[in-house]
Amino acid sequence: MNNMLLKTTALLTLFLSSAAWADAASELQQRLSKVNVLSADYAQTVSSSDGKNVQQGSGTLKIKRPNLFRMDNKTPQENQIISDGKTLWFYDPFVEQVTANWVKDAVNNTPFVLLTSDDSSHWAQYNVEQKADTFTLKPKAKQSNIKQFDIRIDSEGVLRNFSTIEKDGQTNLYILRNITNQPLADGIFKFSVPKGVELDDQRQK
């Protein structure tokens, strides 16, 4: 009898947890869908696992629903992350290298693309919890490099900040400023490999 009670309690707990995750994910997607286009500057703070600030940075963010995303990091080192909806490009001018991944394969390690995604297969890779205006996403795959992705967005769809916590405990916080919602051309989210730059094409693997 006790075993049966324990099993029933465990199943009920699992069911309620799954329902809570589904509700939180639905609420987050609903809030994100309220803003179709966004441009902003961001201030980045990188902190070690013990909470010490180890680096400050800045850059610009552009998103356009559905599935278009661009981050241009300006300081302390230039790099770009661009999603054209199918391919996620990571360009590091310093080492003259571009890495290309299919978006569907990159979501697990690059949750930024969820900010513009309405693809259920992308969202299915994360459990989502909500506490007021902060949503915490945790990847289901154990091999993910990301431990946690937090998004702070209000009920009107205004994105305030987001952060990642990596497996080693390092935190990357991005605080948005100078937010505008002016139209953006799709061409902004296109990427061509610069001449002389090495392409690491993970789409072929």
UniProtKB/Swiss-Prot annotation:
Principal localisation: periplasm
Q: Which GO terms describe its biological process?
A: lipoprotein localization to outer membrane; lipoprotein transport
Q: Which UniProt keywords apply?
A: Chaperone, Periplasm, Protein transport, Signal, Transport
Q: Which Pfam families match?
A: LolA
Annotated compartments: Periplasm
Does the keyword Protein transport belong to this entry? yes
Q: Which residues form the signal peptide?
A: 1-22
GO cellular component terms listed in the entry, alphabetical order = outer membrane-bounded periplasmic space
Q: Which cysteines are joined by disulfide bonds?
A: none
Instruction: Give the superkingdom in one word.
Output: Bacteria
Q: Which InterPro entries match?
A: LolA/LolB/LppX, OM_lipoprot_carrier_LolA-like, OM_lipoprot_carrier_LolA_Pbac
Q: What family is it from?
A: Belongs to the LolA family.
The record describes its quaternary structure and partners as: Monomer.
Q: What does this protein do?
A: Participates in the translocation of lipoproteins from the inner membrane to the outer membrane. Only forms a complex with a lipoprotein if the residue after the N-terminal Cys is not an aspartate (The Asp acts as a targeting signal to indicate that the lipoprotein should stay in the inner membrane).
Q: Which PANTHER family match?
A: OUTER-MEMBRANE LIPOPROTEIN CARRIER PROTEIN
User: What's the protein called, per UniProt?
Assistant: Outer-membrane lipoprotein carrier protein
Give the source species: Pasteurella multocida (strain Pm70)
Q: Which gene encodes it?
A: lolA
